[in-house]
Each structure stands twice: as structure tokens, then as C-alpha cells.
């Protein structure tokens, strides 16, 4: 595979990951803010204030990934949102471990890897633009 094909493939994969994270965090934010009683997780029923806070954070994360797709909005916002999602997933994993729910962190780890991959790819792209 030539270098330009690899770069194009990387851009496609990064775009798919970004889109999936946008959908995930926008959905999670809307569900936590508008329908908190319908959430299936035990922790959500025990911590309604935390559900509201994480709902806002999730929605901001989704918007932080979505807005840079619009014209005249810096793609650095994607990088910052991906870093923020990484911190959020680390905190969520720690939260579950402290609650004795370490079997629940697989999804958090998957999202963490996706966010770090997106941050790596966007950082790499931003450095190439500067050259």
C-alpha cells in the first residue's frame, strides 16, 4: 500500500471513529439529561446528581467532536474533546472499580482507546498542517 493510500485510509478510519464517538456521547448526554429514570444502570439510579453532571459532560464532548466538522471552527477542538473523553473514561473506569464493578469497565476501556486514537490522529494531522 502506498503512503498516500495509507494516509487516506487513516483519515477514513479517524472519521468513522469520530462519528461513532459523536453519536455515542450525544446519545448518552441526551438520555442522561432528558430520560434519567429510564437508564438501565444501577449507579444511575443511586446517583441522580452524577447522572446530570455526566450528562452535561457527555453532551459537551459530543459537541466538541461535532462542531469542528463545520466550517470556520478549529479542528483543535476535536483534539481537546478527545483528550477530555480520555480523562472521562479513566474517571468512569475508576468509579466502577471503586464500586466493585470492575467487570463493567470493558466499554470504558474501548472508548478510551478510541478517544486516544482520535487524539493521536488529529494531533498528527495538525502537525502536518504546520509544516
Model features per residue range: what roles?
Residues 2-131:
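Membrane-interface extramembranous regions
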Amino acid at each position: 500500500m502506498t503512503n498516500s493510500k495509507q494516509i487516506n485510509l487513516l483519515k477514513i478510519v479517524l472519521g468513522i471513529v469520530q462519528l461513532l464517538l459523536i453519536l455515542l456521547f450525544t446519545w448518552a448526554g441526551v438520555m442522561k439529561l432528558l430520560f434519567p429514570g429510564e437508564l438501565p444502570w444501577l449507579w444511575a439510579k443511586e446517583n441522580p446528581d452524577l447522572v446530570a453532571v455526566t450528562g452535561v459532560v457527555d453532551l459537551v464532548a459530543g459537541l466538541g467532536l461535532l462542531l469542528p466538522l463545520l466550517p470556520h471552527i478549529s479542528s483543535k477542538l476535536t483534539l481537546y474533546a478527545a483528550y477530555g473523553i480520555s480523562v472521562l473514561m479513566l474517571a468512569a473506569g475508576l468509579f466502577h472499580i471503586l464500586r466493585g464493578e470492575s467487570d463493567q469497565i470493558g466499554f470504558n476501556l474501548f472508548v478510551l482507546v478510541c478517544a486516544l486514537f482520535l487524539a493521536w490522529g488529529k494531533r498528527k494531522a495538525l502537525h502536518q498542517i504546520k509544516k
